[in-house]
Amino acid sequence: NMMSGIVHVKGNASQSAGATAHGGLLIIDGNASSRCGISMKGVDIVVKGSVGHMSAFMAQSGTLLVCGDAGDALGDSLYETEIYVKGKVKSLGVDCIEKEMKPKHIKKVSELLKKSNIDKIKPEEFKRYGSERKLYNFNIDNVSEY
């Protein structure tokens, strides 16, 4: 389990890259398959390509930054993780919504791009996604969403 430091994948990553990681920075030069960042708990993940379906599923904290596209059900059932995607998102998961990019988010994206040696992409090109916070506590009115 990744707790700190930097892991740099010099190509593509298979399923569940960065699963349950608590800290540090994971850089993937290529694409990441399904469930990238599943249940992440504080790690920052930068994918220079695209991510597959169910990425950031039940992600609790940290950041997932995707320079390409994202597959189905991005951010399904996530908590406080912030997701940034430059390309297209096929679909958002349950309780995941697009959110406003404020100056502090532009700064965060800029820092991650710099740490990952990405200088041809501007932070303003990304969209931000996060939890709508409807599923934090059980509510009978939302039972069909669980």
Residue ranges of model-derived segments:
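Tandem repeat protein-protein interaction scaffolds
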Residues: 3-10, 22-25, 41
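Intrinsically disordered, low-complexity terminal regions
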Residues: 8-10, 15, 29, 35, ...
